[in-house]
Amino acid sequence: MVNDSIFIKKGVELEIEVQSLAYGGMGLAKVDDFVVFVKNGIPGQRVLVLIYKKKKGFAEARIIKVLKQSPLATEARCDHYWICSKLQTLSYEEQLKEKEKQVVDAFQRIGGFTDFTINGVRSAENKYNYRNKMEFTFSPHRWILESEPEGVNSSFALGLHIPGRYD
């Protein structure tokens, strides 16, 4: 049962455990029966999150701090994984299991099918460097990483499109 002092709304911080992945790659956690989608969350993580969006049946949150790392976690190969490939910190084998669960869920919950067989998810021959589409963006304002020195020229940029950013 939710403690009466916890009221889920925009701006509230919560400590929760990510239970699974939702379609699209967000972590899924529940506070009682209330669903909280956690950006960049992976199953098994205990995290402190900030609610940034609240709707009638769910909320969306971003991780402030990982309190306990998931046993399913792995080291990301890319320094910018949190922008372009959020699931790089989830082991590849677990990614395949999650994809299969999502297919089963879609057939059962959305399609209404009960009698079917999934023959597993085929793994890619190469887990990395297989993208066949890239979106580039020109911008008058370069995105500056926190690790870059102050005073870096930010007047022009050509690079990969950052999801959710349109400037």
Specify the residue positions occupied by each region the protein language model found.
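Non-catalytic accessory regions of SAM-dependent methyltransferases
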Residues: 1-167
